[in-house]
A protein has these predicted regions:
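Eukaryote-biased, non-catalytic alpha-solenoid scaffold regions
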Residues: 1-283
């Protein structure tokens, strides 16, 4: 409706209406659309100075700042683009806009990559690894940029600065994935040992990497977690999950015997759970 009303108004009247809307809607998520409408109307009137003033006034809006940064990048005005990005990062910190600072850092990274500024690329990748979400992307970039003889020390320091999630999402963990890539078996084992949430899923995903070095301890962890799970969980779906865990134990050294012992114990302990007995009949 707003678009229709504005489109049938003379330009001056349309600008007046937009100014009113900018005041009454200043806290709405689509405010930037009104700003762009005003800027376009001013440019149609060859009012470039007023258009630029409007843009500067609303640079605190993410969409407007991003639009201006993109224009500067197209014109290869990289230093000015970085200045706007740094301003945006400070605003994001002050206003606590989650994710916005990472957005600006990612654009800065692209500029530094385009201009072959290796030192700045490393600094931004490191910051995005420590504070951002897509950690494996920046881990992989950094591993190609840091000299091999410096990599272990660099990574150790960076990992200590990083706060990783205690949860294994769908059994997965960025921290664990990095230990796998680095073949750091001791730290992977320590992480699995300290996991208190979804430990079975974590073991199913990562234990096989440690079968040559930690099978005995992993079998003990599996057995303890599986006993606890069986004690607390009932129903066919949960029993089928137990049946998915057992082959993972089987792959470890000594796992075949461990599976036989677990199943034998369950057949005695849970003999009054017919659905479990049916699910375990093939073990």
């Amino acid at each position: 409706m707003m678009q229709i009303n504005l489109s049938i108004q003379p330009t001056e009247k349309a600008l007046e209406l937009i100014d009113g809307l900018l005041e009454t809607r200043k806290d709405t998520y689509d405010l930037y659309q009104l700003v762009l409408r005003k800027v376009n109307l001013l440019l149609e009137q060859n009012e470039e100075q007023k258009a630029n003033e409007t843009i500067r006034q609303y640079l605190y809006l993410t969409e407007i700042r991003e639009m201006e940064v993109e224009k500067l990048i197209v014109r290869c005005q990289y230093d000015e683009a970085i200045r706007l990005l740094d301003e945006g990062i400070e605003i994001a910190k002050e206003e606590i806009y989650p994710g916005t600072d990472s957005k600006w850092l990612e654009i800065k990274l692209k500029i530094y990559e385009t201009t072959n500024r290796a030192s700045e690329v490393i600094d931004i990748c490191r910051l995005l690894f420590v504070t951002g979400r897509d950690k494996l992307t920046y881990y992989n970039k950094l591993k190609t940029l840091i000299p091999k003889e410096q990599w272990k020390s660099f990574l150790d320091t960076m990992m200590k600065e990083t706060e990783f999630s205690n949860y294994f999402s769908f059994g997965g963990s960025v921290e664990a994935d990095i230990y796998v890539k680095e073949q750091d078996n001791e730290r992977l084992f320590t992480l699995l040992s300290s996991t208190r949430y979804d430990q079975l899923e974590a073991l199913m995903r990562y234990a096989h990497y440690l079968k040559d070095t930690h099978s005995e301890q992993l079998i003990a962890m599996y057995t303890s977690s599986l006993n606890d799970y069986a004690e607390r969980k009932m129903g066919r779906r949960n029993y089928e999950f137990i049946a998915q865990v057992l082959p993972c134990i089987h792959k470890l050294k000594g796992g075949q015997t461990a599976v036989k012992n677990i199943v034998a114990e369950f057949r005695i302990k849970y003999k009054r759970r017919p659905a479990m007995m049916e699910v375990l009949k093939d073990f």
